[in-house]
């Protein structure tokens, strides 16, 4: 029931992003609406087929062999077999920042990437918990969902940026937005898109925590990993570069130095304390 509700909520939020594109596009007249829809469809298709390549390239990840990482291969193979799913490709990112992510459009085309930092930071039990979380993202099609959400939000930003090029002093009779419409587009469009995208991202992280812990049968292992990652990502954050920001929402922990106040409210990840509390509660129910 919980997963069905979560899936429905995600579908509604994605529908909200798509509707927002159409509403903003309609301010530019029929031509603007057509362009907005075509751009949305094209961006979705591109995100669907290339999300894995884009994320792995952003992290400069390389394929890793079983000879290089036998323990990693063993735990991924065991969990994939237990879930009756194909084994994903495995990659290592050459960065000290501790993190991991999964990417790919479906289980047969998925990849799991661990940074060198997370391999050193976590023990085998904790790393197994992280792998369970990432595999759950794959099995729940969260990579596709987050890629589509990010693509739709990018389209909205494209339309907002385009709005700056439109003269605002004309009337609505010439099939263009008036001053009030332009202000609404530029002020409310990005905010609404961001709020919806964050709601999707946080919802999927909670679900991956729960289903990943269920897959490994060890919620406390993931809770322990999250504690270490919370401290580790603060000490060794990724630099805030555009190429890395495109992949940040896929990672198990916020890879950048945490902000304060409003910036913290707009994080792509749920609060670590809340995630850990949910896992500990889940472990209590299993006892």
From Swiss-Prot:
Its cofactor is Zn(2+). Binds 1 zinc ion per subunit. The keyword Cell wall biogenesis/degradation does not apply. The active site is at 134. Pfam families: Peptidase_M48. It is a multi-pass membrane protein. NCBIfam families: PRK03072.1. One of its GO terms (biological process) is proteolysis. It is found in: Cell membrane. Its EC number is 3.4.24.-. The lineage of its organism: Bacteria, Bacillati, Actinomycetota, Actinomycetes, Kitasatosporales. Belongs to the peptidase M48B family. PANTHER family: PROTEASE HTPX. Keywords: Cell membrane, Hydrolase, Membrane, Metal-binding, Metalloprotease, Protease, Transmembrane, Transmembrane helix, Zinc. This is Protease HtpX homolog 2. The gene is htpX2. The chain crosses the membrane at residues 7-29, 33-50, 148-168, 180-200.
């Amino acid at each position: 029931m919980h997963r069905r509700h979560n899936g429905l909520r995600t579908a509604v939020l994605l529908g909200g992003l798509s509707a927002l594109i159409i509403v903003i596009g309609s301010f530019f007249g029929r031509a603007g609406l057509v362009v907005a829809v075509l751009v949305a469809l094209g961006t979705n298709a591109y995100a669907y087929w290339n999300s894995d390549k884009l994320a792995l390239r952003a992290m400069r990840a390389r394929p890793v062999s079983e000879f290089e990482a036998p323990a990693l291969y063993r735990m991924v193979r065991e969990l994939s077999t237990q879930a009756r799913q194909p084994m994903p490709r495995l990659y290592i990112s050459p960065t000290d920042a501790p993190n991991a992510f999964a990417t790919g459009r479906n289980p047969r085309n998925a990849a799991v990437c661990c940074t060198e930092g997370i391999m050193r930071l976590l023990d085998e039990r904790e790393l197994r918990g992280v792998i369970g979380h990432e595999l759950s993202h794959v099995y729940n099609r969260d990579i596709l969902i987050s890629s589509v959400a990010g693509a739709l939000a990018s389209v909205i930003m494209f339309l907002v940026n385009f709005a700056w090029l439109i003269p605002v002093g004309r009337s609505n009779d010439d099939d263009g937005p008036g001053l009030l419409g332009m202000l609404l587009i530029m002020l409310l469009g990005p905010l609404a898109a961001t709020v919806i995208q964050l709601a999707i991202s946080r919802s999927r992280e909670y679900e991956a925590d729960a289903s990943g812990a269920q897959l490994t049968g060890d919620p406390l292992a993931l809770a322990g990993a999250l504690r270490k990652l919370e401290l580790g990502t603060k000490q060794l954050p990724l630099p805030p570069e555009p190429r890395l920001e495109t992949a940040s929402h896929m990672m198990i922990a916020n890879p950048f130095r945490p902000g304060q106040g409003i910036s913290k409210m707009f994080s792509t990840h749920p609060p670590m304390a809340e995630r850990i509390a949910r896992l500990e509660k889940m472990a209590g129910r299993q006892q």
